[in-house]
């Protein structure tokens, strides 16, 4: 009886002890599991792919003294998002964001002399942006051997299999950031990224929410999704163009079929105009019903395989002009505003025995006016009475050539023998006599450059097995198609020399081959690169084909094949580079006959054009003016101010006022008003001015009232940007940085900013560029500081030993605060250099004087001074950048200013960054010491003999 309760108590105690032991064991297991999870998670995050989309290459190992401990958290911070680089092209540095969230630890670095303390940097680490190659662009293709005699002129990358050639759904650009991923638990982040990439691979055509790639939208009831396909899926709040919803897909007449192809659905959602969407629907349905593309085409060539005549180049053959020399019809297809370069090229190719037919792009009205003046000077020069808006890769270019051929054949007073197409970026590399002698010897031949690779690969690479449609100045990819049976498809370069017999055949023949090929190539990408080749190879004239277009093209695919045309073509393409002086030896080769070269661009390098011109025709007399100068118009009064942006209109007005102040201070004498002026109206014209291939500033032609006589005068002001790049003092031990600049419209191919002068406003998205010398791998820190010392962005860039250029566009919230910004570059947090750029306050909005509410909205900086989601405020004391309350208050008052107060603020900023170098009068002036523009060396009215066209010389030439 007594033993039983004791036994029960003992059992209860044992049970309690067992529970306690199990609890302790469970806690120990939980702790161990947590620590192991943290360790594996950190390892996984350190080795995982970067957020930002796309495949990321591993960074090259840096020297030990440059290595930095990377934070474990790979949050997709806005400061290191991977899609921002490039001058608007969306292909900037391959960025790897590491860190970026407040409170994340950052590895300490060894302190160096003069370095900022690393402890102060811990609360706000900089994201690391790894730039893998010299231009912030990583390519998986093997390096090419540069051959001076290579003339493979296809406009599509050689490694096209590795390139994403779709523009479906959200265009396949890397996302600037994925803020939702940064907030997810680390264990789910990789899974979400993997799922997102799989979805992108599967359904790039998922344009409509809830629709799979194979689902059908009923005709007549296709509303586009709320997000435009030209935008990212998650557009960051700093985005300038809100864009709104995609246009609703409406038709005048519903399509005659169900539009089910993902390419067509994507095109419908992205097309802007109702007419274009109607055309897309009709074209797709006709193709789907088998009514659009020919299935079989007749081959008329009697030869088996591909004919290729060999022609020999004999320098001695040009010593004797043939008895019946050929006469050439030059067809110049030009666009842009480089009228002086065009005139110089025209001067080099002109001969009274040839004919010149010029087509100017429908959008290039200034150039059209200049070309019309040229045509009035010479009877053998005519301008097409019709104009097309040709785009890269578009079917409109082939239409332009075919219509030009028809026009030339109908000109009975022009007895030409050869058709040669040129652009303003071409230049002859041999003389007219040499060209005529060669073509006279081979007058029955046709000269086209073939692709030189296997045909199946060429068809895939060129997209010939895809259906394209041009509308809204865009080439839309609508689906797949079959190559017609019965013919051999060929192609290569779209620059060619064709004899008259073949041009007549292509133009007037109604046989099965020509008729069906015109239909087939009306819906083809880059049709001029294949149409004439294919027709010639399958025609009765097939034995006249020479696999040489007599050109040298400067292909540098490492720089020129970055899919820079995806905003106008649903495909990936290339563009040749401009020639530089170091390329001159290529023009002297004699291995094969070549007579023209491209591309040349005077705003990039005019020296090479001069070298070639002097080589062909001799030097100009000593003392000839303007040989090292180049002027290019960017605005002309007949264009109308609607052709200008508010930023350029604002700054052009300020430049003109800067010139008038120079006239008053340097030309004015006390007691007289003869050199004092009051500005009147908008600028009349604006030119870029270059000297010795260096940008010298803008030339502003403007009207002003002379206060002494109250008469209107026309003046021209030269303004030059001040030097803003500055090496730190005392200089650091780091010597790789050569130059740094900020601007927009970065051209990664030519590695310069196309926005010459860096004219920026509050709604622009600037790009930071750095130029490097050779040296060891290093990591530098870049810091962007606004006019009131708010740190807008900071990030690190890994610079490889062979890097030459890097560029990055930080995703800043807009509007930017107007004023002078500073970009600092540090190495181990030791200042290396800095550069400045101006964000101009706008005096115009929609080309009208800005209203107070608009000014306050644009000029007060971003909401809550937050340029990014992350704050860098703690770096201000570390970088000795105090925020002055009085300066902030003055900025607030400036933001609310309008009228003369706003102009005064703007002009003070412009005067700090630009210098009025000189001013002149284009006509009569009451200012006795004012020089005449035509007598200066810098004015757009000064002599320019190299581009001026005069009377035909006795030898029939102009040059």
Swiss-Prot record:
Residues 39-959 are lumenal. Residues 78-104 have a biased composition (Gly residues). Changing residue 572 to A: Strongly reduced enzyme activity. One of its GO terms (cellular component) is extracellular space. Keywords: Disease variant, Disulfide bond, Dwarfism, Glycoprotein, Glycosyltransferase, Golgi apparatus, Membrane, Metal-binding, Secreted, Signal-anchor, Transferase, Transmembrane, Transmembrane helix. Changing residue 754 to E: No effect on enzyme activity. Changing residue 494 to A: Decreased enzyme activity. Pathway: Glycan metabolism; chondroitin sulfate biosynthesis; Glycan metabolism; heparan sulfate biosynthesis. Belongs to the glycosyltransferase 14 family. XylT subfamily. This is Xylosyltransferase 1. It comes from Homo sapiens.
